[in-house]
Design a protein with these regions (language model features):
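N-terminal intrinsically disordered, cationic/polar leader segments
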Residues: 1-75
Length: 75
């Protein structure tokens, strides 16, 4: 099992996504969500995107997810 503080992204089909151990939401629109993680940034593109459930550690995103990309922190 993964350590509890390591960021984790789980995509379920084309319409649901679980983001664990995120730091903050940088940008939120119904077609684009940008999330700061410990080791980089996750960008989600699609349409009708909704942050369905949110806790201080976990986030569930629903909608039509078209693409997800990751920008790794460069040190």
């Amino acid at each position: 099992e993964i350590s509890s503080d390591i960021p984790k992204v789980t995509i379920i089909g084309f319409d649901r996504m679980l983001v664990e151990n995120y730091k903050c939401i940088l940008e939120y629109q119904d077609f684009f969500i940008r999330i700061k993680m410990k080791s980089g940034i996750v960008n989600i593109n699609g349409f009708e995107l909704v942050m369905k459930e949110m806790t201080k550690d976990d986030l569930i995103i629903t909608g039509n997810i078209e693409s997800v990309d990751y920008e790794k922190n460069v040190m």
